[in-house]
């Protein structure tokens, strides 16, 4: 029954020649950020702590490994193996299974998933910490400068690019 209902909506939408405009007023149901005053104190404390940790280059890899990095990170470094793996090659000619000197691709990708900049952006918005926002932008600008499109390890996976897009939407919110 649910599948038929979904197909019915798809059929109706396919024939629609006029889509309603998005209602961005304060009374609309369109998603928007919550009121800052409603944020619990525990969240504020956690954001303050995380922003200080990230600004000092202490990142959490895979949700549980605390790793000291440069700030901004060296985007071409596997911090777990302590190995730099710079390359100027096209991402389409790289094989992430053939990294040199014991390096692995996942620790190399982890800082580029932008969990740190997301927390910095959240701290900027919720706590009014302008320095966290500037720090977030510094990291993003450094990433862009050091990872040209389709060049290097960070462009070998469409999934990783998608994760960066999701993180960017959080930062941009």
Residue ranges of each PLM-predicted region?
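Aromatic-lined, polymer-binding surfaces characteristic
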Residues: 85-89, 97-98, 102-173
């Amino acid at each position: 029954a649910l599948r038929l209902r979904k197909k019915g909506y798809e059929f109706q939408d396919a024939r629609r020649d006029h889509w309603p405009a998005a209602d961005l007023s304060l009374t609309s149901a369109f998603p928007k950020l919550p009121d800052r005053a409603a944020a619990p104190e525990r969240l504020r404390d956690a954001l303050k702590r995380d922003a200080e940790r990230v600004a000092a280059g202490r990142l959490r890899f895979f949700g549980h490994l605390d790793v000291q990095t440069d700030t901004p990170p060296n985007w071409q470094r596997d911090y777990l193996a302590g190995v730099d793996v710079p390359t100027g090659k096209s991402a389409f000619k790289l094989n992430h299974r053939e990294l040199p000197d014991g390096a692995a691709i996942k620790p190399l990708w982890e800082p580029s998933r932008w969990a740190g900049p997301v927390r910095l952006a959240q701290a900027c918005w919720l706590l009014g910490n302008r320095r966290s926002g500037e720090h977030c932008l510094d990291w993003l600008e450094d990433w862009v400068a050091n990872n040209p499109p389709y060049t290097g390890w960070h462009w070998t996976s469409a999934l990783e690019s998608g994760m960066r897009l999701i993180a960017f939407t959080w930062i941009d919110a």
